[in-house]
Curated annotation (Swiss-Prot):
GO molecular function: magnesium ion binding; phosphoglucosamine mutase activity; phosphomannomutase activity
Organism: Nitrosomonas eutropha (strain DSM 101675 / C91 / Nm57)
Name assigned to this protein: Phosphoglucosamine mutase
NCBIfam families per the UniProt record, alphabetical: glmM (TIGR01455), PRK10887.1 (NF008139)
Name of the gene encoding the protein in the UniProt record: glmM
Post-translational modification: Activated by phosphorylation.
Active-site residues, as the UniProt record annotates them: S108
Similarity remark: Belongs to the phosphohexose mutase family.
Known role: Catalyzes the conversion of glucosamine-6-phosphate to glucosamine-1-phosphate.
EC number: 5.4.2.10
């Protein structure tokens, strides 16, 4: 069954436009509350299910939180409120507090005028599809407020940042520290603004924190993991050893070397995997996505680490890790999942695993990545006016096959429809920049031509 509201990462959209409205969040809170009440938690007779609400630093977070809280309370579910808190912190606290669910009001790396929501199960992982469908079914029913004696209580959680800081530090070996390193931390004016710098500082680093002054509007604005040039400049300006950039909700990370070179999720996962293999603690292989650079796949093959590709989206990376019983997965955008450390992608914890590899080996980024030369990638977004079935179009298929033959084993072609916009993404990867440019343009042109022809034909 197709979901109506939930996408690959919860519900997201523009604030004030359905479904990112107070009215919908009130109904959503009530619907989630009813689903939680219908589950068998084996709670004591006088106990109700409890949900923790976290949010990032967007101005709209408080408005949506109030609506959501009212919905939960009306259904008869207890609520714990926190201040701005990274997404992975909510996932951790749900488990640590032994409560039934968590909700995060955030649109991750999007601008301030967008917002959204995602939920975590009692295990601290994203909700299964079946539960999201149950919630959507419940949304069709009107709100019937629980009797006053059964209304949910609302309390504010204390020292949530402190608990999470200690959890992050616990994933770094006790016998090591970050002394002697100068690290610039870009908090993206987001949910990590009171956390990321403190973690690095308490582990001994000399920390320069930037973009840790959220005003409700500046989240992700020319800063953080989606605008890495700012961090590159700051690392060079401060003469730092490294830079760490998270995104607005703290679930992804990119890093920068002292020379100002950017290392994406693919590179960071490679460093972590190689270090774990050397220490004999890499369990299984590594999961990447359809966007993972072919050079990384080939490098894993050379050093004997199994590698598998999932669809784009941290949910799919997580699912494939569980299926294979592997522990390390990543997207090039910086979502890195270390399943032995946390249930979900965590920017700070992932950065700490990389810093552990650097500290433990005494090597730097360039040393650990010397055996990987990234293949050039050319990405073209082709705008289409209506649903065009490119997968079953003969001309597109012929053009793609020709390109695949020309590129051979040292190239890759990926065509995929955007999940949010009327676009088809064409990605061609190979060793020769001119060759991939030629084929990317040719395939994109063919798709454009066929899409127009199919519109005219209708």
């Amino acid at each position: 069954m197709k979901k109506k509201y939930f996408g690959t990462d919860g519900i997201r959209g523009k604030v004030g436009e359905f479904p990112i409205t107070p009215e919908f969040f009130l109904r959503l809170g009530y619907a989630v509350g009813k689903v939680l009440l219908a589950s068998d938690w084996k709670l004591a007779a006088d106990k109700r299910p409890t949900i923790l609400i976290g949010k990032d630093t967007r101005i709209s977070g408080y408005m949506l939180e109030s609506a959501l809280e009212a919905g939960f309370s009306a259904a008869g579910v207890d609520v714990l409120l926190s201040g701005p808190l990274p997404t992975p912190a909510v996932a951790y606290l749900v488990r640590a507090l032994r409560i039934q669910a968590g909700a995060v009001i955030s649109a991750s790396h999007n601008p301030f005028y967008d917002n959204g929501i995602k939920f975590f199960s009692s295990e601290g992982s994203k909700l299964p599809d079946s539960m999201e469908l149950q919630i959507e079914a419940e949304l069709d029913f009107p709100i019937e407020t629980a009797p006053s004696i059964k209304l949910g209580r609302v309390q504010r959680l204390k020292d949530e940042e402190g608990r999470y800081i200690e959890f992050c530090k616990s994933t770094f070996p006790n016998q090591l520290d970050l002394r002697g390193w100068k690290i610039v931390v870009d908090c993206a004016n987001g949910a990590d603004y009171q956390v990321a710098g403190h973690v690095m500082h308490e582990l001994g680093a000399d920390v320069v924190t930037i973009h840790a002054n959220p005003d409700g509007f500046n989240i992700n604005h020319e800063c953080g993991a989606t605008h890495i040039m700012t961090l590159q400049g700051a690392v060079l300006q401060h003469g730092a050893d490294f830079g760490i950039a998270v995104d607005g909700d703290g679930d992804r990370v990119l890093m920068v070397s002292g020379e100002g070179v950017v290392y994406d999720g693919d590179s960071l996962a490679y460093i972590i995997a190689k270090h774990r293999q050397q220490r004999g603690v890499l369990q299984g292989g590594v999961v990447g996505t359809l966007m993972t650079n072919l050079a990384v796949e080939q490098a894993f093959e050379r050093i004997g680490i199994p590698f598998a590709r999932a669809n784009v989206g941290d949910r799919y990376v997580s699912e494939l890790l569980q299926q294979n019983d592997w522990y390390l997965g990543a997207e090039n955008s910086g979502h890195i999942i270390c399943r032995d450390k946390h249930t979900t992608g965590d920017g700070i914890i992932s950065a700490l695993q990389v810093l552990y590899a650097l500290r433990d080996t005494g090597l730097m980024f360039a040393d650990l990545m010397h055996d990987v030369t990234f293949f050039p990638q050319r990405l073209i977004n082709v705008k289409i006016s209506r649903d065009f079935d490119f997968q079953n179009d003969q001309a597109v298929e012929i053009c793609k096959n020709e390109a695949e033959q020309a590129l051979g084993n040292d190239g890759r072609i990926l065509l995929r429809a955007s999940g949010t916009e009327p676009l088809i993404r064409v990605m061609v990867e190979g060793k020769d920049p001119q060759q991939i440019e030629y084929w990317a343009e040719k395939i994109a042109g063919t798709i454009q031509q066929q899409a127009v022809a199919s519109t005219v034909g209708h």
